[in-house]
Amino acid sequence: MPARDRDEGRLHGSADGAHGPDQDLAVLQAALLPAGVPILPRVAVGARYLLAEVDTAAGGDWYDTVVLSDGSVGLVVGDVVGHGIAASATMGQLRAVARHCLESGGSPAGVIAALDRFARDLDDAHTATVCVVVLDPTTGALRVSSAGHPPPLLLTATGPRYLGRPAGPLATGAAHAQAEDRMADGDLLLLYTDGILERPGVHPAQGGDDLADAATHLRERLDGGPAAQRFCDDVLALLIRSTGYRDDVTLLAAQRHAPLGTVELSLPDTPVAVTTARAALDTWLAALGVDDLTATAIQHAVGEVVTNAVEHAYVDRPGGPSTVHVHVELTETGVVEIAVADHGRWRPPSDHPYRGMGLTMAVDLVDDVRIDRLPSGTTVRLRHHPNRAVTLSTRPAGTPIAPMPDEPFLAALTADDDLDAVLVVHGPVDAAGAVELRDQLRSITGNGTVSRSVDLSRVTLLASAAVHVLYEARDRSTAHRERLHLLAPRGSTAHHVLELVGLHPLEQI
């Protein structure tokens, strides 16, 4: 399938349909994100990505799941300021750096440090946020590090809790620590972006409470098996059903569970062997949760190999041992490995035009086929790397469009020509408001040469673009040995966001 067709196929249509440049940007977004999440023996992974309709452009949310050589799993979610091609390109670069660091054995804190160094030389990555988790599925050990990103939510049998401590975004000079925790079987970890918290009309702190409540409720309704994908779908539907959403929303969930068993079969060299193998494999693949296309491909390939063994392995050894052995397992790194062994003699395909077609089909259906030919018998080994597709969605039918804010953005000084005057900011500081706020701050601080105070107590939304502007203004002031005082009382929208990203505000106004 051509790459563009594949990426367009990952886009789940909006309620109104997307066409033209917006569709092209969405296709770009799909091309820069992973096509799916791995299927693993001890941890179920699910993801959802909901594209924003406000700004009608591809955004900077991103995620990744990296299976490491020792079977550990790296989980990453990040958010780049802004929308459009620049944001998508930046998140693609950050994703590549994070993946390389994880595959090279980097710890979560090490990955954050590498991203921070990279972001210093890439303007569009300044104040990007990211959370990195490494999970050992065997022991349940968790390591977490974050740069200005909302903390991951761990759901356990005793209740929910958020992990880690807040620190500043990338390229802001913040120190990034690493926390440790542990997951038991059945526990579920959720990484996400702020789009699920900062829904229209919802205070960010309330958004965090809503997420914990919804996630706890939905986890209790899971039917006992691993259901990370359904969990993501249900959390998204429950939280945006009544409020709608403004920004991209990304969810990445991992649920630890008991290991998936193997399939071991010893079959007679009769046609019933094929039927028995297919039935056992069908049950195992259903427990694995692969999609229908993958299940069909694996079933077909195994059926062809078992048929070959039954029909040809023992034709010149009548009366001897005539058993076909089938072994199926999912490795710690997410590879389905199947071995079909017999004690007969390998017979290369004849010149007959229809001989050897079964093996040829098997080679085309799975990732890798190897044949071990020994005097004691033949073993055919099949390997296939399944994953669970992740759909990039626009607004699902029935979801309300984010309403326009009742209060417009406004920023004004309390008095003109007064160095003690405070810049008071009202309303939502979204991407458009951030541009105006940048101009205001440059003007009143003389590009950082005059100390000023900014009252953010009346802000109803402080988007990542606004955080970027505030960091820029703070750094300009610091460079000139001046101060930019950010005023936000505890409990306010701005206080919640500023604490999260490491721009600790003054609480007394």
Language model: regions and residue ranges:
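C-terminal catalytic subdomain
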Residues: 184-185, 190, 197-280, 286-296, ...
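Amphipathic alpha-helical interaction surfaces in cytosolic regulatory modules
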Residues: 300, 306, 428-507
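Catalytic core of PPM/PP2C metal-dependent serine/threonine phosphatase domains
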Residues: 24-42, 46-47, 51-53, 59, ...
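Helix-loop-beta hinge of the Bergerat
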Residues: 43-44, 58, 146-151, 260-294, ...
